[in-house]
């Protein structure tokens, strides 16, 4: 249902129309007078070779704990998804060779985030897509091959759409209903990143199954919508009026300024993720029994933030965590040493436990267990719903204040 058009919208339309009349060439004037300063599209500007960190690599960790034939079975996700076999793992080291296509698929698939590409990290990518989705009627996620030009502000350009993990898709479509993938038909058939199409279809399908929401799809470049969202345009207009000193008009329409409101939304999301980590550390401890600090990956942190706002979605998720058969466990501790995020615990009494919120569900601990005492079983995803301690404190404070007011009356 369309939003009601009022006098504020009419004024905005008139202002925009006058702006186009007064400056019909827009940004073309500068390029005509000085062609050297024209920004040109270069796909390499949106690509970056991943930096591997062997400390968090599951196979590297296993190489120092078990035989090599067992170590190679712990994880091969990056090797399997790389379209040009550019990743080389040799015992305790990981190397990305020079034939890397810089597609970013290894960063998406690695459960422990062993491959670092700054622009593809979950936090940065969420902020970029969320900002575009909040500002415009539609936000498009696409790749350099599909777009072939400089992106507009509501187009998020990636080396491959498959670089977006399911955790990020889940968090985004739970919060926004205007995100689409733009890929012309058959564009992936001619791409040398041969594993990219399967990657993005699997990740999006899983996120849609868990969220019961959907990602849009656009194959026609001429059908892309670059209109700014009504709420954003109104917010920006009111901010312009505020700066111009027209306080009377602003007083009757106190909508938050568009850019400021979106910036606040992004900051609030970052603050929420920080509070979640702090709440987890207070609830289960920031260190494992071994004394090592627990690590919360960016992808997992994004999911926890989404579930805190939409706890009902937890019931649709299916995640597996290790479960210990105490009759087989010899307390050797290999499982604990294998876990790179320190989600596994083995206390002095021999009790094995796992913190589901930190566990990345890789199954490496079960693979390296010499006695096969660990098996991966479905966990209760509601364990991933982190209490919002600060919100609960505010509610208690408000309830106490209300009772005092009633008592005074």
What are these regions (language model features)?
Residues 232, 251-294:
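C-terminal segment of N-terminal export signals and the immediately downstream linker at the start
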Residues 100, 106, 233-235:
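Short, cationic motifs built from Arg/Lys/His that form the positively charged side of catalytic pockets
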Residues 60-63, 78-81, 85, 103-116, ...:
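Cys/His-rich metal-chelating microdomains
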